[in-house]
């Protein structure tokens, strides 16, 4: 096993522990708590994959961080912080919408890259909007936290979420996953719209109804992917 993989996991475990202590003092805002909850799932998945105990990894991560801080001067720390662009967190869903459980009468699930797509194929003839919580950097989508499909009545009928055991995804991965979800929902004569905010940081263009305008090549690719699978 790569030593960098192990030490990265150890540091992530300790930093999560620090953030959890911060949240326990009721100091975290909604985006902070949302990331904390999702990072916990990711760490559990990584720990299982690597075969490492999270408590032991947290202690080792503490030693690594302490050693770095002892060697770091205040001036170097200021320069590092100033040189790293800070991502922005955009929330289209409330915590209730993100944490709400939902059921599928005819479930369909597909994994593409490190993203899991789930949808209810029993839904027909509905108007559906896709909303997401995600981070952006340099005015482009950096990381998807969670995307969900809602009917006009507020029911959840689809979802795209990162797999805890496979961290990391690209903007292109998110676009492809959205295309698969849209195609699957439209298969049953549903009308699907993408929220304006999500649209702005992915394709950066839309029609008057907020429908994503996929490039022709990508649209053909999505059609070939969707027809035999959904």
UniProtKB/Swiss-Prot annotation:
Region listing for RNA-binding and homodimerization, in residue ranges:
1-73
Which key words are in the record? Eukaryotic host gene expression shutoff by virus, Host cytoplasm, Host gene expression shutoff by virus, Host mRNA suppression by virus, Host nucleus, Host-virus interaction, Inhibition of host innate immune response by virus, Inhibition of host interferon signaling pathway by virus, Inhibition of host PKR by virus, Inhibition of host pre-mRNA processing by virus, Inhibition of host RIG-I by virus, Inhibition of host RLR pathway by virus, Interferon antiviral system evasion, RNA-binding, Ubl conjugation, Viral immunoevasion
Task: Explain the purpose of this protein.
Answer: Inhibits post-transcriptional processing of cellular pre-mRNA, by binding and inhibiting two cellular proteins that are required for the 3'-end processing of cellular pre-mRNAs: the 30 kDa cleavage and polyadenylation specificity factor/CPSF4 and the poly(A)-binding protein 2/PABPN1. In turn, unprocessed 3' end pre-mRNAs accumulate in the host nucleus and are no longer exported to the cytoplasm. Cellular protein synthesis is thereby shut off very early after virus infection.
Q: Where does this chain mainly localize?
A: host cell
Name of the protein in its database record = Non-structural protein 1
The record's listing under Pfam families reads: Flu_NS1
What organism, scientifically named, is this protein from? Influenza A virus (strain A/Chicken/Hong Kong/220/1997 H5N1 genotype Gs/Gd)
The subcellular localization recorded is: Host nucleus; Host cytoplasm
Q: Where is this region: Disordered?
A: 207-230
Which family does this protein fall into? Belongs to the influenza A viruses NS1 family.
On whether Cytoplasm is a keyword of this UniProt record, the answer is no
Q: Which GO terms describe its cellular component?
A: host cell cytoplasm; host cell nucleus
**Modification comment:** Upon interferon induction, ISGylated via host HERC5; this results in the impairment of NS1 interaction with RNA targets due to its inability to form homodimers and to interact with host EIF2AK2/PKR.
Q: Where is this motif: Nuclear localization signal?
A: 34-38
Swiss-Prot/TrEMBL domain comment: The dsRNA-binding region is required for suppression of RNA silencing.
Give the residue ranges for region: CPSF4-binding. Answer: 180-215
Motif Nuclear export signal — list its residue ranges. 137-146
Q: Which GO terms describe its biological process?
A: symbiont-mediated suppression of host cytoplasmic pattern recognition receptor signaling pathway via inhibition of RIG-I activity; symbiont-mediated suppression of host gene expression; symbiont-mediated suppression of host mRNA processing; symbiont-mediated suppression of host PKR/eIFalpha signaling; symbiont-mediated suppression of host type I interferon-mediated signaling pathway
**Which terms in the Gene Ontology molecular function aspect does this entry carry?**
protein serine/threonine kinase inhibitor activity; RNA binding
The record's subunit annotation is: Homodimer. Interacts with host TRIM25 (via coiled coil); this interaction specifically inhibits TRIM25 multimerization and TRIM25-mediated RIGI CARD ubiquitination. Interacts with human EIF2AK2/PKR, CPSF4, IVNS1ABP and PABPN1.
